Structure formats: C-alpha cells, structure tokens
C-alpha cells in the first residue's frame, strides 16, 4: 500500500 497522498510514484 502506498503512503497517503502518493500515487504510484516510482522509487
């Protein structure tokens, strides 16, 4: 699960 406010941001 991504952090809140993040939308599929590559590492």
Swiss-Prot record:
Record GO terms (molecular function): peptidase inhibitor activity; toxin activity
Keyword Flavoprotein part of the UniProt annotation: no
Modification Pyrrolidone carboxylic acid, positions: 1
Tagged with keyword Cell membrane: no
GO biological process, alphabetically ordered: regulation of blood pressure
Tissue: Expressed by the venom gland.
One GO CC term, this protein: extracellular region
Alphabetized UniProt keyword annotations: Hypotensive agent, Metalloenzyme inhibitor, Metalloprotease inhibitor, Protease inhibitor, Pyrrolidone carboxylic acid, Secreted, Toxin
Compartment annotation: Secreted
Family per similarity comment: Belongs to the bradykinin-potentiating peptide family.
Physiological role: This peptide both inhibits the activity of the angiotensin-converting enzyme (ACE) and enhances the action of bradykinin by inhibiting the peptidases that inactivate it. It acts as an indirect hypotensive agent.
Protein's name according to its UniProt entry: Bradykinin-potentiating peptide 11c
Source organism of the structure: Crotalus viridis viridis (Prairie rattlesnake)
């Amino acid at each position: 699960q991504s952090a809140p406010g993040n939308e599929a941001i590559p590492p």
